[in-house]
UniProtKB/Swiss-Prot annotation:
3'-> 5'-exoribonuclease involved in ribosome biogenesis in the processing of the 12S pre-rRNA. Displays a strong specificity for a 3'-end containing a free hydroxyl group. PANTHER family: INTERFERON-STIMULATED 20 KDA EXONUCLEASE-LIKE 2 (PTHR12801:SF78), RNA EXONUCLEASE REXO1 / RECO3 FAMILY MEMBER-RELATED (PTHR12801). Keywords: Exonuclease, Hydrolase, Nuclease, Nucleus, Ribosome biogenesis. Pfam families: RNase_T. Residues 194-369 form the Exonuclease domain. It is found in: Nucleus, Nucleolus. GO terms for molecular function: 3'-5'-RNA exonuclease activity; exonuclease activity; nucleic acid binding. Residues 81-97 have a biased composition (Basic and acidic residues). This is Interferon-stimulated 20 kDa exonuclease-like 2. Its main location: nucleus. It comes from Rattus norvegicus. Residues 42-54 have a biased composition (Polar residues). The gene is Isg20l2. The keyword RNA-binding does not apply. It comes from the Eukaryota.
Length: 369
């Protein structure tokens, strides 16, 4: 077994003098010097030293410095006061000079009163005169005076035979002036309404292609000019293009307009207009839209056209047959299919044949929407 030896010293340790930092000692000396000179504030000084400094009388050099500083401050205050007084005096002089032309220097009592009155008169004459109120145009009294003066001057200058013309002029003036100026001329209630003709071509969708979907729409104005003619891609898959009748082929659907956008464009054109069509209910069904009956003209339901074509009124004639009979024109010919633009133009020309008579009939028997 190894033994452990411990050397313990129970005596008091030797006290070493704490020298401190030389830089700190220099700072303390400078601080004491500044405190003695009075450059440090009372907050930075301990209370014991502050009381000593206050109790000690100032030295000769310090008193001279304080006196010089106080003299400089007093001089600066005096200069500021003098400058302020000069400014006030200059402003008062300017005010007096600006108002001197209103108050003349009186030599005697009578002269001063007369001068004041003259100046007041000049001042009032220089002021702008108030404008007189003019009477309203619709008032009756000034009109009578003007008419009387005009008649008197005209009678003096002209003979008796020439007095009739100014009387007529005055009558016209009275009639025009009696009418209120704010009212505009009345607009006729029955304005000519805009009219368009429409024709649509369909393709077969749904089971076995039995559902008719819109594939082309053409709209022409009253003069036959084309307003709208677009191929339209239906939302459903096309089973039968019906090219023999519609003229629609697969290539026409490549860049065709979608149904929703085409429908919104078409309805904007039709809104508020008289729409002419042949068997137009089929076109409205393909558009998923129904126009007001009062603004719809269906040439397949007008008996006047059947009468002109020497056909029974109760029979629904095709557009091709009516065009051949009444317009002496052949449409829908060839194997390329129908043209919706051609059909719309033919429909409009057929309606123009009976437009006046049919519109009178509708005015007497308006259709119920």
């Amino acid at each position: 077994m190894s033994t452990i030896l411990l050397n313990l010293d129970f005596g008091e340790p030797s006290k070493k003098a704490f020298g401190g930092n030389a830089k700190h000692q220099r700072f303390v000396k400078k601080r004491r010097f500044l405190e003695q000179k009075g450059f440090l504030s009372k907050k930075n000084q301990p209370p014991s030293k502050v009381s000593k400094l206050n109790s000690e009388p100032p030295k000769k050099g310090e008193t001279s410095r304080v006196d010089s500083i106080s003299k400089i401050l007093s001089c600066l205050k005096k200069k500021k006061e003098a400058a302020a007084s000069k400014r006030d005096s200059e402003q008062s002089k300017d005010k007096k000079a600006s108002l001197s032309w209103l108050t003349p220097a009186p030599s005697k009592k009578t002269d001063s009163v007369v001068a004041k009155i003259d100046l007041l008169g000049e001042f009032q004459s220089a002021l702008p005169k108030p404008k007189r109120r003019t009477q309203k145009k619709g008032s009756k009294k000034p009109l009578k005076k003007k008419i009387a003066t005009e008649n008197s001057t005209q009678t003096q200058s002209k003979d008796k035979g020439s007095n009739k013309k100014p009387l007529k002029k005055n009558a016209v003036q009275n009639s025009t002036q009696a009418q209120p100026e704010d009212k505009c001329p009345k607009v006729p209630q029955s304005l000519p309404r805009k009219m368009v003709a429409i024709d649509c071509e369909m393709v077969g969708t749904g089971p076995k292609g039995r559902v008719s979907s819109l594939a082309r729409c053409s709209i022409v104005n009253y003069n036959g000019d084309v307003l709208y003619d677009e191929y339209i891609r239906p939302p459903c898959y096309i089973v039968d293009y019906r090219t023999r009748w519609s003229g629609i082929r697969k290539c026409h659907m490549v860049n065709a307009t979608p149904f929703k956008t085409a429908r919104s464009q078409i309805l904007k054109i039709l809104s508020g207009k008289v729409v002419v069509g042949h068997a137009i209910h089929n076109d409205y069904k393909a558009l998923q839209y129904f126009h007001p009956k009062s603004l719809t003209r269906d040439t397949s339901q007008i008996p006047l056209l059947n009468r002109k074509a020497d056909c029974p009124e109760n029979v629904t004639l095709s557009l091709k047959h009516l065009t051949k009979k009444l317009l002496s024109r052949d449409i829908q010919t060839g194997l390329s299919g129908h043209s919706s633009v051609e059909d719309a133009q033919a429909t409009l020309e057929l309606y123009k044949l009976v437009e006046v008579e049919w519109e009178q009939h509708l005015a007497q028997n308006p259709p119920e929407n």
